[in-house]
Every structure is written in structure tokens, then in C-alpha cells.
Swiss-Prot record:
One GO biological process term: spermidine metabolic process
Requisite cofactors: NAD(+)
Species name: Saccharolobus solfataricus (strain ATCC 35092 / DSM 1617 / JCM 11322 / P2) (Sulfolobus solfataricus)
Gene name tied to this protein: dys
Gene Ontology annotations for the cellular component aspect, listed alphabetically: cytoplasm
Keywords for the protein's UniProt record, in alphabetical order: Hypusine biosynthesis, NAD, Transferase
Protein name as annotated: Probable deoxyhypusine synthase
Cross-referenced Gene3D superfamilies: Deoxyhypusine synthase
An example Gene Ontology molecular-function term: deoxyhypusine synthase activity
Length: 312
């Protein structure tokens, strides 16, 4: 059997926009190639730039698995630089951001490592990212137990997005998504906030602390932001609840003006994750005259390319 130390040698590292400066003209290369998937990258870059320039409400929507990778730091930097002013994501994003902010280290691994062996070695596997037991559950539990009593001491009811700001306020890691959102006053909307370690620990602590999370306040906020905006756009990475919650709320003001989907899901099974923007038009979630594109590919490749193009 492989030694645990041999598997946990190379940590995953966060990147920032500064790491992408030398690639700021890379989309021009894809424009020359153009064929097949390159067209999506070129169009996605153009729409993203126009969205950031013209839309006053700009959604960054992504799934939690990406926060276990080096994209975590890039998401934080995109928030810091003001490219996006609202985030919609899933419960695991909070787990991974807290774990990595408070000492948890994730490691480079492989999709093909024996999972029974990993369990015996007390290592979780997330795709090809290895997460030692001690870098995940216990870290999150300790953080919630440490900070939640002081956060809820004088507030017995709090919205989820304000609760996340409170945790972000207590983070010193410059690559933290929660910290960046707190610093920039960007709300993080997590409709499935109870789905994960963070949510489970909130439930456990609620049995000892007298507090409630008011998710209706999160809905009120997103409603107010959408109805007060002139134009809205979204970079939607992955599918599931974070994708749907983003496009769902935009239907009530005739839909998004801009939409960039990055996905590996297909539409043949009727899934929300695989649905293209044109289907959302039929639901009033994206405007018929909106500028939109679907880019098929791994987000860990596509997102850095699009982010780099913002620097050109």
C-alpha cells in the first residue's frame, strides 16, 4: 500500500489575475484557430467584456467542486477587482473556503487512486484533488463552534448572506472568497446552504444557541437587486442549484441581458445543468435579444482563459 506521506506531497495552489497577465492576449490565438470549441471561447470573452462594461448587476455563479482547486483564488480576485457584484453558489463552496482559510491543505492527486485505500488512509478524493480528513470536517466544525456564538450573541435572526459576511470578516487569507465578498460588500447567495459540513454544523449549534437563519431575507435581497438593475448578466459555471437560482430570479424582470454558460453537461436528458440559454429564453429567464453563449469544457481550463482576456 502507498504511504500517506507519498500522496500528500504537492498542495493545490490558488491563482490570481496577476498569474494570468502574460496570457492576456490568448483569446486572439483562439480567434485565429476559430474552429469548433475555440469559437465559444472567443464569443464568451466578447460577451463577458461587454457584460462587465454595460451590466450594473453581474452574477458570478459556480459550483463548489471548483473551490477545491486553484480557481478559488481567481474567484476571490474577480470579486476584489469588482468584475462581479453578486455570487450564487452551493453549500460546499463555504466548506472548502473555510477549510482552506483556516489551515486545511488540499493536494494534487489522481482520478485513478484506489478509493478504499484512500479511506483507510483517511483521505477524501474530489476528482483528482485529495483532501485529508484533518483538512476538512474538523476544521469547519472548529471554525463554526468558535465564531458562531459571538456572531449570534446579539442577533438571534440573521440572513444567510450576512452570516457569510460575518465569517468572511474573521478570515485573513487573501485568497478567500468569503473574505473578498465581505471586503467588497458582495452578497454570496447559497440557496442550499444546509447541504454540506457548514450547514450541518449550523444545525448542530442551533440546538445550543438561540438563533435562526432567515433565508427569505436572501430572497428579498436578490429580488431587490434584480428589480433595481438596468441590465443584468451572468457568468454561470456548472449547473445545479447555483445555475437555476441565478436564472430563476432574473425571469421576473424579463431575463438576463447577458449569459455565459461553461459546462460539460448535455441537453439530451432534459437536465437543468445541460440546458442551453435558448431553453431559458422560453422560460423568460434570458431575454430573446440577450447575448449568450455556451462553452463546453472543463472550467479549470476555460475560466482562466476568460479571466486573462479581461486584462487585455
Amino acid at each position: 500500500m502507498i504511504n500517506r506521506e507519498d500522496l500528500l506531497k504537492n498542495p493545490v495552489e490558488d491563482i490570481t489575475l496577476s498569474d494570468l497577465k502574460k496570457y492576456n492576449d490568448i483569446v486572439s490565438v483562439f480567434d485565429k484557430i476559430y474552429g469548433f470549441s475555440s469559437e465559444g471561447i472567443v464569443n464568451g470573452s466578447k460577451i463577458l467584456k461587454e457584460m462587465i462594461k454595460n451590466a450594473d448587476l453581474r452574477f458570478l455563479s459556480f459550483t463548489a467542486n471548483l473551490v477545491s482547486t486553484g480557481l478559488r483564488g481567481l474567484f476571490a480576485d474577480l470579486i476584489k477587482k469588482g468584475y462581479f457584484n453578486i455570487v450564487v453558489t452551493t453549500g460546499g463552496t463555504i466548506d472548502h473556503d473555510l477549510a482552506r482559510s483556516f489551515g486545511g491543505v488540499y493536494y494534487k492527486g489522481s482520478f485513478d487512486i484506489d478509493d478504499t485505500m484512500l479511506k483507510d488512509l483517511e483521505i477524501h478524493r474530489l476528482g483528482n484533488v485529495l483532501v485529508p480528513f484533518e483538512s476538512y470536517g474538523k476544521v469547519i466544525e472548529d471554525v463554526v463552534r468558535k465564531f458562531l456564538p459571538e456572531i449570534t450573541k446579539d442577533r438571534k435572526e440573521i440572513s444567510a448572506y450576512e452570516l457569510l459576511w460575518e465569517f468572511g470578516k474573521r478570515i485573513t487569507d487573501s485568497n478567500s472568497i468569503l473574505r473578498a465578498a465581505y471586503d467588497k460588500n458582495v452578497p454570496i447567495i447559497v440557496p442550499g446552504i444546509l447541504d454540506g459540513s457548514f450547514g450541518t454544523n449550523l444545525f448542530i449549534q442551533s440546538q445550543f444557541l438561540n438563533f435562526r437563519i432567515n433565508l427569505f431575507e436572501d430572497m428579498r435581497l436578490i429580488k431587490d437587486l434584480i428589480f433595481s438593475s438596468k441590465k443584468s448578466g451572468a457568468l454561470i459555471i456548472g449547473g445545479g442549484i447555483s445555475k437555476h437560482h441565478t436564472i430563476w430570479w432574473n425571469q421576473f424582470k424579463d431575463g438576463l441581458n447577458y449569459a455565459i454558460y461553461i459546462t460539460t453537461a448535455q441537453e439530451y436528458d432534459g437536465s437543468l445543468s445541460g440546458a442551453k440559454p435558448r431553453e431559458a429564453i422560453s422560460w423568460n429567464k434570458i431575454r430573446p435579444d440577450a447575448k449568450h453563449v455556451t462553452i463546453y469544457g472543463d472550467a479549470t481550463i476555460i475560466v482562466p482563459i476568460l479571466a486573462a482576456s479581461l486584462l487585455s
